[in-house]
From Swiss-Prot:
Membrane-topology descriptor: Peripheral membrane protein
Protein name: ATP synthase gamma chain
Lineage: Bacteria, Pseudomonadati, Pseudomonadota, Gammaproteobacteria, Vibrionales
Family affiliation: Belongs to the ATPase gamma chain family.
Record-linked InterPro entries: ATP_synth_F1_ATPase_gsu, ATP_synth_F1_gsu, ATP_synth_F1_gsu_CS
Gene3D superfamilies hit by this protein: 3.40.1380.10, ATP synthase, gamma subunit, helix hairpin domain
Length: 288
């Protein structure tokens, strides 16, 4: 059994670590609230844009934008959104597992894959994994802006415009609640038709486009893709802070359990030392 001094040193070390994890838990909780507010503020715009675009996909337009046309998939692209920092449990690895499963399915069908990665964790993972990373972006911080994402999104849109991509997906963790963060893969292009059954049943009208459908749709569809990627980034950020808060709380609780166990070992070691000293004193007295 380790000596009392050594055990006391271990207890002190674990307590120091516990203070750090507790502080990180509190910081993550504070950032989580701010990121949830940001996510909630941008979600109505993204949801409305998705509904409008879904309606367009159902409509009979005199101008058919290439983003509305389904074509044979020979090459697909993924925009993968991860965190820049770790210590957030299995958030990133669960996301990577999901996208790798999807990539494997495409590869088995002979389809080539291009990747645009957002976040240093995705950059490191897919560069190591061997994916064809054609664009990367990291260091967005806790207040990402749409302007910081336009370059990365633009690379994928350009390849799609040139016919070098036939499908485009965005991959991110979706915030369900503080206990559930779900990795999702959503199709951006070609434009998925609305899944709203009520809209399908009542789709007896269409928008009137002024001045012309082409310039309006050209701008609107690009804005749609950008808005969905931005929403993915802010949702993933909220998921990151929640996951880190939970991970740090678990670490803090585990540290408390370890301290309790070490305290018991320390008490036993101290009791053993006292018993031994008493035995030596009694033995010495008997000898005299």
């Amino acid at each position: 059994m380790a000596g009392a001094k050594e055990i006391r040193s271990k207890i002190g070390s674990v307590k120091s670590t516990q203070k750090i994890t507790k502080a990180m838990e509190m910081v993550a909780a504070s950032k989580m609230r701010r990121s949830q507010e940001s996510m909630a503020a941008s979600r109505p715009y993204a949801d409305t844009m998705r509904k409008v675009i879904g309606h367009l996909a159902l409509g009979n337009l005199e101008y058919r934008h290439p983003y509305l046309e389904e074509r044979e998939a020979k090459r697909v692209g993924y925009i993968i959104i991860s965190s820049d920092r770790g210590l957030c449990g299995g958030l990133n690895i669960n996301l990577f597992k999901k996208v790798m499963a999807g990539m494997k399915t495409w590869s088995e069908d002979g389809v080539e894959i291009d990747l645009a990665v957002i976040g240093s964790k995705a950059t490191a993972f897919f560069n190591s994994y061997g994916g064809n990373v054609i664009a990367q972006n990291s260091g967005l911080g806790d207040k990402p802006s749409l302007e910081e994402l336009i370059g990365t999104v633009g690379v994928m849109l350009k390849k799609y415009d040139e016919g070098q991509l036939d499908r485009l997906y965005v991959v991110n963790n979706k915030f369900i609640n503080t206990m559930v963060q779900e990795p999702t893969i959503d199709q951006l292009l070609p434009l998925p038709k609305s899944e709203d059954e009520a809209m399908k049943r009542t789709h007896a009208w269409d928008y009137i486009y002024e001045p012309e459908p082409k310039p309006l749709l050209d701008a609107l569809l690009i804005r749609y893709v950008e808005s969905q990627v931005y929403q993915g980034v802010v949702e993933n950020l909220a998921c990151e802070h929640v996951a880190r808060m939970i991970a740090m709380k678990a670490a803090t609780d585990n540290a408390g359990d370890i301290i309790d166990e070490l305290q018991l070992v320390y008490n036993k070691a101290r009791q053993s030392a006292i018993t031994q000293e008493l035995s030596e004193i009694v033995s010495g007295a008997s000898a005299v």
